[in-house]
């Protein structure tokens, strides 16, 4: 998993509340267990028309936001079913940070496991970030995980809280496998001792 230290990029405003995981990645994309290639399915029912052409009104199809790295979203983002494909799709599209007032619990946990930083902020701070994001090509935000702050294009800052353990994992690029490998020396030592006591 890639480390998350400081992220600077365009922020796309998605002013929709209760975006569920079915909307993030529709069911027809759930047949794969690969984490790559799902970006094309991200918000596909909103990004594409029935004939397969792009919907120019959807934010991620607009030129300024095609390469967005940050998503500023309405309340209760990622609610619904527990599909881990939702953060996979966001990550494959290039989004590494989602900012909202609240998240679905399972989606929130899955983000951390996949190198995405979900940030909870107050409604007042979210409104401020929406204003920043709506600047289009000038909608660059900087997310500094070490200092736990979001810096806007005018230099304004928004502070956020994060669990210290999850912060450690993101800063060091540690997923569940990485956390296990951190204990490799202890595991090897334990297994060696077991081998010496095969009768036990």
From Swiss-Prot:
Disulfide bonds: none annotated. One of its GO terms (cellular component) is 3-isopropylmalate dehydratase complex. It catalyses: (2R,3S)-3-isopropylmalate = (2S)-2-isopropylmalate. GO terms for molecular function: 3-isopropylmalate dehydratase activity. One of its GO terms (biological process) is L-leucine biosynthetic process. InterPro entries: 3-IsopropMal_deHydase_ssu, Aconitase/3IPM_dehydase_swvl, AconitaseA/IPMdHydase_ssu_swvl, IPMI_Swivel, LeuD. The keyword Lyase applies. The keyword Manganese does not apply. Keywords: Amino-acid biosynthesis, Branched-chain amino acid biosynthesis, Leucine biosynthesis, Lyase. It comes from the Bacteria. Its EC number is 4.2.1.33. Pathway: Amino-acid biosynthesis; L-leucine biosynthesis; L-leucine from 3-methyl-2-oxobutanoate: step 2/4. SUPFAM superfamilies: LeuD/IlvD-like. Belongs to the LeuD family. LeuD type 1 subfamily. Catalyzes the isomerization between 2-isopropylmalate and 3-isopropylmalate, via the formation of 2-isopropylmaleate. Heterodimer of LeuC and LeuD. This is 3-isopropylmalate dehydratase small subunit. It comes from Bradyrhizobium sp. (strain BTAi1 / ATCC BAA-1182). The lineage of its organism: Bacteria, Pseudomonadati, Pseudomonadota, Alphaproteobacteria, Hyphomicrobiales.
